[in-house]
Each structure stands twice: as structure tokens, then as C-alpha cells.
């Protein structure tokens, strides 16, 4: 496949991916149709670079990365260290216990912590907890 840039890549993507992207919320035409730089080559701190090398200040700051910025050196170092150790098994890693303890220490109202792999799983868990606590089957949800 020929390498495409920006809007041309996005237009092509829309022919093979419904909506042009794999996430429901990140469609370029929602922001600036035909001009929005839909794809980025790299990101560091609060900046992103498009496929042509143009640098932008990311005013959206993504979801979650706004706390530390993109490509945080300390985070990258820790992630790479753990990837090299082998990070994909069916077994549990001890770090989840240490992280759970930190979460509980920061939230005195919590006596336990549970982690999920993504938003959908977190929502499903929240709904189960709501049903258990309220003894009601229906749960109002907006989002």
C-alpha cells in the first residue's frame, strides 16, 4: 500500500474502517473537516507531530496523558524495563498488589481496589456494583 498523509489517509481509512478510525469518539470531521491532521507520527510532553513533521500544541491533551504529558521519560523507562522482563503471561504480577495498596492509601474510603483492562470492562464492573449495592436491576447510565 502506498504511504498516504493526513486527510488522504483519513479518506482512505473511511473506505475500509467504519468511521475511518477504530474508536467511536475520535473522528476528525468532528473537529475540522478536510483539514484536521487526523494522524500523528510522534508525541512528546504537550506537543504532537503530524505525518509531515508539523509540530502542534495538543490542546486536547488526550485522555490521561495530560497529567504527565506524552512520552514521559520516567514512565517510558519503567515500561521498557518491564517489557524486557516479559509482561504478557496468564500469571499475576506483584505490582498490581503494590498499586492497589497505593490506591487504597490515597482513598481512605476504599478498603479494596480492583483494576480493569479498559473502559468497557470498568463500566460493566461499575454496573454490577451498582446493582449489588442498590438491589435494583436497572441502572441509569450516561456516557
Where in this protein do the model-derived segments appear?
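Active-site-adjacent loop/helix segments that line or gate small-molecule/cofactor pockets in enzymes
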Residues: 2-42
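Short, hydrophobic/aliphatic alpha-helical segments
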Residues: 4-12, 48-54, 104-105
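Short amphipathic alpha-helical surface micro-motifs
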Residues: 5-7, 28-30, 50, 95-97, ...
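N-proximal short alpha-helices
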Residues: 18-22, 48-49, 72, 76, ...
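Short active-site-proximal "capping" loops at secondary-structure junctions
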Residues: 30, 45, 64-66
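Active-site and channel-lining beta-strand-loop segments
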Residues: 37-58
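Substrate-binding/gating loop at the entrance of the active-site cleft, primarily
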Residues: 142-143
Amino acid at each position: 500500500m502506498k504511504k498516504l498523509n493526513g486527510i488522504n489517509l483519513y479518506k482512505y481509512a473511511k473506505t475500509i474502517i467504519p468511521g475511518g478510525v477504530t474508536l467511536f469518539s475520535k473522528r476528525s470531521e468532528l473537529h475540522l473537516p478536510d483539514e484536521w491532521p487526523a494522524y500523528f507520527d510522534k508525541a512528546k510532553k504537550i506537543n504532537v507531530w503530524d505525518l509531515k513533521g508539523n509540530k502542534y500544541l495538543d490542546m486536547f491533551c488526550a485522555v490521561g496523558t495530560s497529567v504527565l504529558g506524552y512520552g514521559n521519560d520516567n514512565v517510558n523507562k519503567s515500561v521498557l524495563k518491564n517489557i524486557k522482563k516479559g509482561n504478557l503471561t496468564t500469571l499475576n504480577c506483584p505490582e498490581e498488589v503494590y498499586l492497589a495498596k497505593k490506591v487504597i492509601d490515597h482513598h481512605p474510603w476504599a478498603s479494596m481496589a480492583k483494576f480493569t483492562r479498559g473502559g468497557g470492562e470498568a463500566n460493566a464492573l461499575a454496573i454490577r456494583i451498582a446493582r449489588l449495592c442498590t438491589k435494583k436491576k436497572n441502572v441509569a447510565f450516561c456516557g
